[in-house]
Amino acid sequence: MQRFFVEPHQIDEAAHQIHIIGTDVNHISNVLRMKQGEEVWISDGGQKEYRCAIEAFSADEVLLHIIYAQEPDYELPSRIYLFQGLPKADKMELIIQKAVELGAYEIIPVETKRCVVKLDGKKAAKKVERWQQIAESAAKQSKRMLIPNVHQVLSFKEALKYAESMDIRLIPYELAKGMQETKEILAAIEQGQSIGIFIGPEGGFEEKEVEAAISEGAKPITLGKRILRTETAGLAILSGLMFQLEN
């Protein structure tokens, strides 16, 4: 069943109706070619989802009838922020898609010293807009209750500042101590804590960047004896955290 997201003001629980507006109108009417009576899931971007039936179509709105509402437990009990060093080509699209599926709360693109890709101004804004669309599509597909935000591109220094208030900050590093210490660090993470994960681009972080992150409170961890690509590393950590934190 198709899933869509709405703002709270689009929901009229007293009248048992939800008003779909914006680009989803065209998607429902002309792309999916849905008909009156067909059912969809609607998320309010918070804790509630609604099973609805299509009641009527107009040029700028799809009117839904609420069949029932529920408060499912789809989201992870911790907010996970993925600080991803800008990779080459279209790898960021894959990273965002899979990070959303695995429960990331926000994805922050980061420009580090070894990044080949450099984004600024209109180019950066256009990329972030595209990435946000990918996050929304992945959220719909994976039954997320919210659409994870794709932040504007930050410098590494700005990223460290942004992560200051997070309870846990992790940075995979080839010189980190053994797997046992990494397991202990991950096992100590509790539900409800906010978690920042720093992933380098191709070529990894410069040593000075790792030192700066550690001085700001980040904990170096290992991802094992094998070398992981930048598009794999963050997803490996997210997978482990998902299994550990999932209710």
Which residues does each predicted region cover?
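Active-site/ligand-binding-proximal alpha/beta "capping" segment
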Residues: 166-204, 209, 218-221
